[in-house]
Amino acid sequence: MRENVKRVLVIGSGPIKIAEAAEFDYSGSQALKALKEEGIETILVNSNVATVQTSRKFADKLYMIPVTWWTVERVIEKERPDAIMIGFGGQTALNVGVDLYKKEILKKYGVKVLGTPIEGIERALSREKFRETMINVNLPVPPSLSARSEEEALEKARQIGYPVMVRVSFNLGGRGSTVAWSEEDLKRDIGRALSQSYIHEVLIEKYLHHWIELEYEVMRDKHGNSAVIACIENLDPMGVHTGESTVIAPCQTLDNKEFQDMRSMSIDVAKSIDLVGECNVQFALNPLAYEYYIIETNPRMSRSSALASKATGYPLAYVSAKLALGYELYEVLNKVSGSTCACFEPSLDYVVIKIPRWDLDKFENVEHSLATEMKSVGEVMSIGRSFEEALQKAVRMLDLGEPGIIGGKVYNSKMTKIDSLRMLKERRPYWFLYASKAFKEGATIDEVYEVTGINKFFLNKIKNLVDFYESIKNNKGLDQKTLSIAKRLGFSDYQIASAVGLSEKDIRELRQKYGIEPKVKQIDTLAGEWPAVTNYLYVTYNGTEDDIEFSNGIRKLLIVGAGGFRIGVSVEFDWGVVSLLDSASKYFDEVTIINYNPETVSTDWDIARKLYFDEISVERILDLVRKEKFNYVATFAGGQIGNTISKKLEENGVKLLGTSGHSVDIAEDREKFSRLLDKLGIKQPDWISARSIEEVRKFVEMVGYPVLVRPSYVLSGSAMRIVYNDTELVSYIKKATEISSEHPVVVSKYIDNAIEAEIDGASDGRGVYGVVLEHVEEAGVHSGDATISIPFKKLSPETVHKMKESIHSISRELNIKGPFNVQFVVKNGTPYIIEMNLRASRSMPFSSKVVGKNIIDLALTGVIKGFDFDEFVELKAKSWGVKSAQFSWAQLKGAYPFLGPEMRSTGEAASLGVDFYDALLKSWLSSSPNRLPDQKGIALVYGRSNVEYLQASARNLSEYGMTVYTLSDAPIYGYEVTSSGKSVELIKDRKVEIVVTDGYLKSLDYEVRRIAVDYNVPIILNGRLGEELTKAFLLRKSNMTFYEIGEYGAGI
């Protein structure tokens, strides 16, 4: 019997953070679809402006406001929903739901919790209650004791004996968790661990060194009917967070008894917490004896459940939402097979491998070793019919410049066996690259196992790949049989060509001559036992025939997805892909997506007519164009990855939709683009295209420091840096040329104290639609880290007119057909162009939703039909919109928090308002761990740059009612001075409510900034933002507006 509800409130997860990423865009979107199918009105609270979920196609009503209990209470008071769903927005949504329950807000308004009851959620997420629950139902857990203070934690650790694992309650991503090998370790880390717990509780647990970690995904309905959807095996052992682990499904190394015993126990765990919906249950298995423990469960959609869903084809989030409405498993249809019910457990005739993606090089002082805390910012998933094939594909998907596990930079480096084993022992990211290098240099399986704890089954497979590669490299022979084996082992044409001394084109032609072609296979959830009705596809060389027939004689488009997320490429580009899909369906008979990110909406089973879950490379796309006969390939929606390969695709005869690959190359190549601006008479900062440090030094002698070093073909400011002296210059030029060695480095004069602005737009080669965006922070802070407003606040109409004229001129010269983004710095009213991207931009979901027009849809209209004008038409907002960056400093242990031209944020949030300060305050509060500071607390304000803005910030905070302190080494005049050491103690004692600073001061305030983020204290890293935000505290603290997005005249 279905729950009798007509209006349901769904809580989203807010902006993308490390450990709480786009998997909740996918799961929340599926839940909203399931509700809509039932005719239920949906109300969504989510401040993540970048997601598809916050577009009109999913929820009936949308509140883009901070995801907190007190803001959600305002929505409940206004909308009066019958029920609430809190299992589809990560830990953020669960915490909000628990707070609403405990404060009796749900009871007050008669709101029913759908899915797992709050008491069950608490039993799962409180480490102490979970341990007690497991013991009560006779399920094995490691020796462990809970603690709520530092003294108690030290005492419990002595009772258990070192080493111990510290686990944090009501938390995700392992934030604050650690392995303590001694009391000294525990004393150092326990304060941070307790600060990261929502309920100030930790579990001190026996550390299970080198045990195998496994996960089971369980579905359960309200009557106790259960299905185990997937068993996922972590290749990395216990001690590495599961989000940091390379994982494989189905499990490979379990015997039948182990598999069945843990399967049964996972169902018992679900029963013990009264699960309704989906959970994942984590186990530790002793590799040397038949011994295992239950580690934890997550009673919600999670990173693992998103992976399991994409790996098996089983729509977990959709089914979970149906179960939360009261359906039983047998009543829910599996829409992938179209004929089986949700109680059928999936069966796989392929293997899936997930590898995380890290961006640790962007952060100073960060710990690079993998451990109990998540640091990865994204992940990729590959599908193959052998471990070797899937692993090689996954490595290429990481987009690190590695052609596979073998034959790349690490494999061909001068690293010795000892060096490789050291990197493995230190648990550096991408361990498989160092393992293959170690085997190449003569390491044994036992030696690699000793330092990694990785099962020898997997190590043997990697060593076999090394042995095969070395054999063809040494023999230089490539007959039909050898080439066929190489392709079945996952080697790319490039890898094979490098081994035997031929070109990639030679290998492609040889393959086609021998008839060695990849086969298209279909994911049906039941290993071919039932036919599938959806085209959820992958490509393999381990097959003899295609599972599908290819349609001809119709208009077909292939859209290139965004690939794995990283800093600079996140869910906003998936929004671009899905927006293009929706728009293209009006003009094409069959629209197909190729992508390999398990977190995204674009890789859902029911989004595209066809989905290729496969690698994005020139080789793969040429294979698919040969089979499918696509009329066009669209590379502009998914960010940088498509732009990077567009020119090569065009050179190989592929017809690109929109702007030509030649024009894209001009815009992406800093030197070519700078020459174009000179030709058109458009202002830009003084620049030089340099191929040597000597050339740069001559340029610097003319223009003076500081200068900006900018390599070509990069995203999110990779290797981009403001340099202030010769020492920094030598260091950064070296780094930049390593990133883009085929292209010269452009060095430009850095214009300080300038306003930065952008225009998002679409063109048909003549007419232009555009939205003007303005940064709060001065130029020099990467646009992805900046606070951005629509409409502009500081720019003059005359300056904006010049910006529009420049863009109109460029769009005609390059014949831009599609979306674009242009960035300007403005000094004394004069705009200078610093960058142009001929693709969807990071800010496009924000600009589209604020002005109420989908720029991707406009762009495709321009490409297909053209516009009926030849001018710049500005798209204007009816209210104010502000976008704020979400940083994940707390997850990146040791990293020094500061802003610069290289991007470091992991996500973004936005809000709308009746004025700038209304929108700004809500937007900032939407990013974690930001909160309104307690007026009785201390504010710490200091810095050596933007001092006048810091002075204003201190003045505003003082007027707000706070006690303002400043650092003796970088003081703000007129306020009580304190030392760095004293400031650290004040933060640890939880007396500091907010820190406002500016610039790069690592030598004097590293510990202050680091302790602030470790103890969840909001930190503002720019003086100009500090002044505006503290003014917002004064103006808008008690009168923020909380309207539905349509009431602001916004939304798409």
From Swiss-Prot:
Binds 4 Mg(2+) or Mn(2+) ions per subunit. Pathway: Amino-acid biosynthesis; L-arginine biosynthesis; carbamoyl phosphate from bicarbonate: step 1/1; Pyrimidine metabolism; UMP biosynthesis via de novo pathway; (S)-dihydroorotate from bicarbonate: step 1/3. Residues 549-930 are annotated as: Carbamoyl phosphate synthetic domain. The keyword Ligase applies. Coiled coil: none annotated. Residues 1-399 are annotated as: Carboxyphosphate synthetic domain. Mg(2+) 3 binds at residues 823, 835. Residues 931-1052 are annotated as: Allosteric domain. Mn(2+) 4 binds at residues 835, 837. Belongs to the CarB family. This is Carbamoyl phosphate synthase large chain.
